[in-house]
Design a protein with these regions (language model features):
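Secondary-structure transition/capping residues
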Residues: 3, 44, 135, 139, ...
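Generic recognition of stable, solvent-exposed alpha-helical segments in well-folded globular domains
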Residues: 4, 119, 123, 178-181
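A conserved beta-strand/loop element that lines the FAD pocket in flavoprotein oxidoreductases
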Residues: 1-9
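Active-site substrate-recognition segment that forms the wall
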Residues: 9-16, 27-67, 71-163
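SH3/SH3-like beta-barrel fold
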Residues: 19-23
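Hydrophobic/aromatic beta-strand patches that form the interior of the parallel beta-sheet core
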Residues: 4, 34, 166-168
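C-terminal lid/capping helical subdomain adjacent to the catalytic/cofactor pocket in oxidative enzymes
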Residues: 162-167, 171-235
Length: 235
């Protein structure tokens, strides 16, 4: 196995015998391709104009001291998700850091700006103040964003896309859990196995064509703002 890290694929030429992935520094040739590249799958020749790209953001503290842990009840590592999906996810990691996640934004061009991360960090600080007012003064050590892909109809990509081309994408907001399940099932499918997961995923609806990007962006921004406000104290 050869792993090419930090190697952007600019285009793919799907051929009858060999597929050619064109990069800045050369070509990678493969008989078979598995596309597991989230929204970028729509730039790889399949399901164009279907992705609703959204960024969600997280912030994490430095490791807490024993006194700081005592001040919040000396909890063991935990993870709490909100009843309202646009509320705040809160975790205490094994290395004693608090991690908060909320804020969604439309990712024009599948990208996020530094100003978007700074805005999210301010919202995370509000959530920190609300939950642990005496501890919140320590702030955050790191803040970041990550891309997730939605479809207007909630559809997902899974299975054979072309001759010796397979794909899995559009986890619709649960990338770790669904991504793991998609990846395992896709590998099984490629080598000719059968499983209940393959059967379920193969019968899920595919992403439908979305509205024009400018309409989608307005809709996503309005919806996320409303849902964030509706979450109330869970944000």
């Amino acid at each position: 196995v050869k792993v090419y890290e930090n190697t952007q694929v600019n285009s793919i030429d799907y051929g009858p015998q060999t597929h050619i992935c064109v990069t800045e520094n050369g070509e990678i040739r493969a008989r078979q391709i598995l596309l597991c590249n989230a929204a970028y799958l729509t730039k790889s020749g399949f399901f164009s104009n279907t992705a609703i790209p959204v960024y969600t953001y997280g912030s994490i503290t430095r490791p807490l001291t024993e006194d700081e842990l005592d001040s919040i009840g000396s909890p063991k590592p935990f993870g709490v998700i909100p009843a309202e999906s646009f509320g705040t996810t809160l975790r205490l990691t094994n290395d004693k850091r608090l991690l908060l996640r909320n804020v969604f934004s439309y990712a024009r061009g599948f990208k996020s700006k530094t100003s978007d991360i700074e805005y999210a960090k301010k919202k995370h600080q509000v959530a920190f103040d609300r939950r642990y007012p005496d501890l919140a003064k320590i702030g955050y050590e790191h803040s970041w964003g990550g891309l997730l892909t939605l479809a207007q109809n909630g559809g997902m990509v899974f299975g054979k896309l072309g001759e010796r081309v397979y794909g899995a994408a559009f986890c619709n907001g649960t990338g770790v859990a669904r991504g793991t399940a998609f990846g395992k099932a896709l590998a099984e499918l490629v080598v000719g196995q059968n499983s209940r997961s393959i059967e379920i995923l193969s019968n899920r609806p595919k992403p439908n064509y979305g509205l024009p990007n400018w309409i989608t962006e307005i809709g996503v921004r309005a919806t996320t703002k409303y849902r964030f406000m509706k979450s109330g104290l869970e944000t």
